[in-house]
Amino acid sequence: MRVGPTGVCNQRGDSALGFNTRICRRDFLNAALLASGNTLLSSLAPSQLLGQQPSWGGYSGVGDYRGANGNTEDVMLGGHAVRDGAFRTRASTAADTGEVYDLVIVGGGISGLAAALFFKDEAKPNQTCLVLENHSIFGGEARRNEFVVDGQRLMAPQGSNWFAIPSSVEQFYERIGVNWREFKYQEWGGPPPAMPLSRSSYHHARQLPSPANFGFYFGANFGRQPGMWLIDPWNHLEHAPLSAQMRSDFARFLTEYNRAPIHKSEAELRRLDSITAEDALIEHCGVSREFIRLFVAPHEAAARGLGPDALSGAWYLRMIGRAGEIERHSFPDGNTGFPRHIVKTLIPEAIAGPHTLEAVCRNRVTFAALDRPENQVRIRLQSTAIGVEHEGEPGKSDFVRVAYTRNGKIYRLRARSVIMAGGGWITKHVVRDLPPTHRDAYDQFHYSAHLVANVALRNWRFLHKLGLSGGRWFEGFGYWTEVRTTATFGSDSKAIGPDSPTVLTLVVPLFYPGLPTAEQGSKGRRELISTSFREYERRIREQMVDMFSSSGFDPRADIAGIILNRWGHAYVNPQPGFMFGKDGKPAPGEVLRKGPFGRIAFAHTDLSGSMGHQMAIQEAQRALTQVLKLLG
């Protein structure tokens, strides 16, 4: 297994926590940087951060996604430089590539790649497309981490995690060669009885009620030292160290959560869009605000960025109570399988081997094949768009100028049309001639930060001994985790048991109930950037020791590696007014969707208020339809 430098153990208990063991680990910010604390973002310009050692991101794994864990240092600094206008006076010095494309797509996540595939399906044979992607590999948040633990290759999602059937985009799955009927999962290989495992990193955590092999952990904040695990909590709430009112709220929420009426009148939706989801939940479920902030807020923040106190009541209630009979699936690496299959469809040579689930998942990317001149669709990695602007008046222009940085140099090219498929937080800084209506719309989009920590384990006997495959907790670091069974086409072993190596994924939303929506996002980003890899590692180890040492967990022996994925703008947070507009203004998403601005269309998934891959694909199809009308 690849090992990085571990630094100096200088706190009491470091040895017991396993800091002096040989695992995958690397600190990312030095002491001088960390001294700036929460003022880091506001007090240091990107140029002051450049060159700081050791690396910002920590250990990043092996394989295609090594060096691409979350928003890396280079990507983060490049984005901040664009935001701060660092390239505005330098664009004139850009080297002209001489290239002219019919379509340039800014952003190589699922939205951008889907738009490229729709283009290839609809365009004339001589029409060309270029995708600019600022990371070292395509996929956006649908990327993976890879470990090798005791000879076994393990994969885990960096962000985007699972998909459901039926789906509004099933035809797209078929187009890219993803047959969900072929998904087979690891069978139980441990002692009887077989323990049911989730197919994703958090399905049991979000399932209401969760299965019997899921638990709640209560620690010092609940008067429990040592803490206690409550197994199968939904059926044993009377044993929870909670007040009678709180236990009643748990039971009431379980009953009412999935009874949210799907069909509401427009008048009722407009009313709900004027209040927070927290107030709407109090109306709908009759639970206390205290209960919502203890249990519902982290439950929802992991899926929607922030808790109900910051979200639109109409948008939120539209998203719950509609699960119905769905079948959940996950690639071994989360939804990383979707961008890999799209790229394999666009450029067959880009991933070695046949177009099968196993080959596309396990074979390496041929990076040299992505940007070949003979490709109708080219993908150019490590290329950050810094300026997109029409040549002349937008309504009369025939071309758009596109400037980007790559390997420290600035380049420019021309396009007959552009689709902005990156996030709205950066799009509003990249499109130079954006009109006031669109800028005002973008100002109504708010985003929150997220941390996804993948912890590779040599075994998970400590969980099985408790009768658990996963659990939730209500204090300390993170909120839940669980063992999952992975699709066999991507795993080295066809069976899983407590002796098997596995990866626990900790989804850690950064939210602060009670603060304004925008302020919560800013505060979360400050925390994400100003906390060192070593400090996050310490919190992970301490949390796991607190919860599992009584059942045999030993961080020195059991943890094989840790990778952090930091996402500064992981989720859009639809605040009250997002669905129908506010103060006489139209809904911000509709302003950007209604048609192209000149020769520029907008396709990022946050326009819908939901960061799911289905919406990414649908937004891409809409935007591509708009630009095809321009191309004729």
Predicted features along the sequence, with ranges:
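Glycine-rich active-site loop/strand segments that organize a redox cofactor
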Residues: 58-63, 136-168, 187, 264-265, ...
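Mid-domain catalytic core of redox enzymes
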Residues: 377, 381-505, 509-514
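N-terminal export leaders
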Residues: 24-41
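N-terminal secretory signal peptides
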Residues: 1-27
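Active-site/ligand-binding neighborhood in enzyme catalytic cores
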Residues: 248-383, 391-397, 583
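N-terminal glycine-rich phosphate/pyrophosphate-binding loop and immediately adjacent elements
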Residues: 77, 87-259
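Conserved flavin/dinucleotide-binding core of flavoenzymes
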Residues: 52-92, 456, 462-632
